[in-house]
UniProtKB/Swiss-Prot annotation:
Belongs to the glutamate 5-kinase family. One of its GO terms (cellular component) is cytosol. It is found in: Cytoplasm. ATP binds at K15, T174, D175. Catalyzes the transfer of a phosphate group to glutamate to form L-glutamate 5-phosphate. This is Glutamate 5-kinase. It catalyses: L-glutamate + ATP = L-glutamyl 5-phosphate + ADP. Keywords: Amino-acid biosynthesis, ATP-binding, Cytoplasm, Kinase, Nucleotide-binding, Proline biosynthesis, Transferase. It comes from the Bacteria. GO terms for molecular function: ATP binding; glutamate 5-kinase activity; RNA binding. Residues 281-359 form the PUA domain.
Amino acid sequence: MTRSILQSARRIIVKVGSSLVTNEGSGLDRQVLGGWAGQISRLKKMGKEVVLVSSGAVAEGMQRLGWKTRPAALYELQAAAAVGQMDLAQAYADCFSEYKLLTAQILLTHDDLSSRKRYLNARSTILTLLNLDIVPIINENDTVVSDEIRFGDNDNLAALVANLIEAEVLVILTDQEGLFTGDPRKHADATLISEISVSDPHIETMAGGTSSGIGRGGMQSKVMAARRAARSGAHTVIASGRVENVLVRLANGEAIGTSLLADMPVKVARKLWLADHLQVRGSVVLDDGASRALLSGGKSLLPIGVVEVRGNFERGEAISCLNTSGREIARGLANYSARESHKIMRRPSSQIEAVLGYVGEYELVHRDNLVIL
């Protein structure tokens, strides 16, 4: 089932672990990075949008600093990340330039995705980069996060990015073949699971530990990441990054690794999240034309269609869209605060900059962040 979905998927998150970008922990393997760039270039030629979540900054920093073992102290890890992140970003930029592709570095913290305003900003930035045919390369901003609020590992970060931009598929590449019925290093009869639902209660007991001393995430974290990605409807494939041309072969529908299936499609999951899981902070009243546009045309909500703003909401918070009779017809994420919305309501989008002095978005609520009730 997922093989065909992977073939038809337009937006893919690819996560590569430290063991797949370093030379056994002794710094970045630029030849390997070039291989990932080449495969992603081929995926893009197939019409796919690809976001790369890459580990490797700490490992590269350790090599630069001459450290043989991964430090336990957070401040030392942050120092290694600060040293290594520059080399990681430059190495990827050089590799992708061989295929005439631009890259963009994005460093995220948990606060960026828990704050509604910063969540919306991060989402808009990544989607804009994809529209510009640029490859976003994402990592956790290790240099500033505290141990209590870190993502935990890049498996979890990749899943959250899948949630953020509604990716259809998350591909987690590791140094293991996939999910087995047991730890193959301990159980000779363990077999590779080709396909399983993320809601299967047995998958956590099947997950083993990490096989590398360089990274942080073991199979357990990959299963948890798959479950998190499934909340927004994304399927996950866990496969070995050692398989030749693994990304291209997966995109062509070849059965490699383990597919963990989400229980609902991306669009359905997104609509349920918008409708049921966000606290509404305010509302806007729409004129008849705007109401018709939302209900029948699948349009975004523009400021010109708003006749009244109620409540005190901020950018990125959920608001209700009411018709002139006061009935809620839609719900979505506001691109502007209540104060800003009041200033630009009843005005064409072309006047937003003149009124506010800047333009965040041309829509008050974008259709991708809107659900009809």
